[in-house]
Amino acid sequence: MNLHEYQSKQIFAQYDLPVSKGYPCETVEQALKAIEKLGGDQWVAKCQVYAGGRGKAGGVKVVSSEAEVRSFFERFLGKRLVTLQTDAQGQPVNTIYLEACAAVKKELYVGMVIDRANRRIVFMASTEGGVNIEEVAEKTPHLLHKVAIDPFMGAQPFQGRELACKLGLTGKQIHQFAHIFCRLSKMFSEKDLSLVEINPLVILQNDDLHCLDAKIVVDGNALYRHADLKSLQDPSQEDPREAEAEALGLNYVALDGNIGCMVNGAGLAMGTMDIIKLQGGLPANFLDVGGSATKERVAGAFKIILSDTNVKAILVNIFGGIVRCDLIAEGIVAAVNEVGVTVPVVVRLEGNNAERGREILAQSGLNIIAAESLKDAAVQAVNAAK
């Protein structure tokens, strides 16, 4: 689960991490009061959306007057911001964060992720702040320094000091960086996070370190023990189809293709998407109905898939292990009748009660294309979508 920047900075402040004073604003009136409270003659206005790349899209700007604040709010508030990380529709800007402008001397990068291969939380830092860190990791990996956090001992100050020296920090900056290193690591573990980024962590003109940005992603599987974080979720930033799928117990991710996919099992779902691509098609979604699929969930899955107007065909690929193919077949028939599916539906059933499932589909009288194999199913779906 993503958090907005202003929410992330509020959590940063709880852990004694240096952040700028700021106010989230939902109206121009709130914004004018905010700059009055902040004082000074320059402020930074930041559109609050989950996606990155706001700056290049114009969603982050230094403003120097009430007129510029009004202009920025009129341009973005209530509109949708399109960045390199969003689709063509963008994400809605319901809140704009106003904070004091900082005098920056140098930009650094700091981040934390879970290294699943090594089963460790990894702290990363680089002198290349304020840029796409993926490019740094790919083109100049020697500039991205990493420290693995021991799960029993936790982050140690000496590790932070060593990392600070690698970044070329000196004097009080070494102590400040060690503090940020330890507090950030503590926050990561206590809040069950899966990602933290400060891009950039800056050196101010007075040589202090300061968190100019803040990004937090919470492990969704741990939200049951973090009601305070769960309450921060902003449904408007998420695809409504994905929210509906979550309510039905389905795993759904929208994509840009035109072949809808309904599969049981994440691995089989990814394999199905791969073979569609291999046959020259483009999957419109990832959808895993899970091992306890019911008629209602199958019908719900069809509705979600068909809510995407780009879908020209649907491929249903079910391997009956825990789930019975005959129940899936009944769900498909019920869904097609209920929803009124107008696009071709290709079905491949294998495993538990697969033969009975095929009989149900054949006797339904519906225009459902039966496939003999996964490759055959992909070929027929690609042809049907043309």
From Swiss-Prot:
InterPro entries to which the protein is assigned, alphabetical: ATP-grasp_succ-CoA_synth-type (IPR013650), ATP_grasp_subdomain_1 (IPR013815), Succ-CoA_synthase_bsu_CS (IPR017866), SUCC_ACL_C (IPR005811), Succ_CoA_ligase-like_bsu (IPR005809), Succinyl-CoA_synth-like (IPR016102)
Superkingdom to which the source organism belongs: Bacteria
A Pfam family recorded for this sequence: Ligase_CoA
Keywords, ordered alphabetically: ATP-binding, Ligase, Magnesium, Metal-binding, Nucleotide-binding, Tricarboxylic acid cycle
GO annotation terms (biological process): succinyl-CoA metabolic process; tricarboxylic acid cycle
Binding site for substrate: 264, 321-323
Name recorded for this polypeptide: Succinate--CoA ligase [ADP-forming] subunit beta
Record organism: Actinobacillus succinogenes (strain ATCC 55618 / DSM 22257 / CCUG 43843 / 130Z)
Lineage summary: Bacteria, Pseudomonadati, Pseudomonadota, Gammaproteobacteria, Pasteurellales
